Amino acid sequence: MKKTDKILKEIGIQRVAIMEGKKYSKGFMEDGDIGVQY
């Protein structure tokens, strides 16, 4: 369950980031990992 929860959380964060758009995209490109931002 934990692995699935982590994946779902990351998908949720990614979805928010897509809606937020440019606000987060630079950080994602630099880090190369969605999780690093949070």
Swiss-Prot record:
Reaction catalyzed: L-histidine + H(+) = histamine + CO2
Gene Ontology molecular function, alphabetical: histidine decarboxylase activity
Disulfide bonds: none
Keywords recorded for this protein, A-Z: Decarboxylase, Lyase, Pyruvate
Enzyme nomenclature, EC number: 4.1.1.22
Group of enzyme by EC: lyase
Details of cofactor binding: Binds 1 pyruvoyl group covalently per subunit.
Lyase listed as a keyword: yes
Cofactor(s), names only, from the UniProt record: pyruvate
Source domain of life: Bacteria
GO biological process: amino acid metabolic process
Self-association and partners: Heterohexamer of 3 large and 3 small chains.
Protein name, per record: Histidine decarboxylase small chain
Origin species: Micrococcus sp
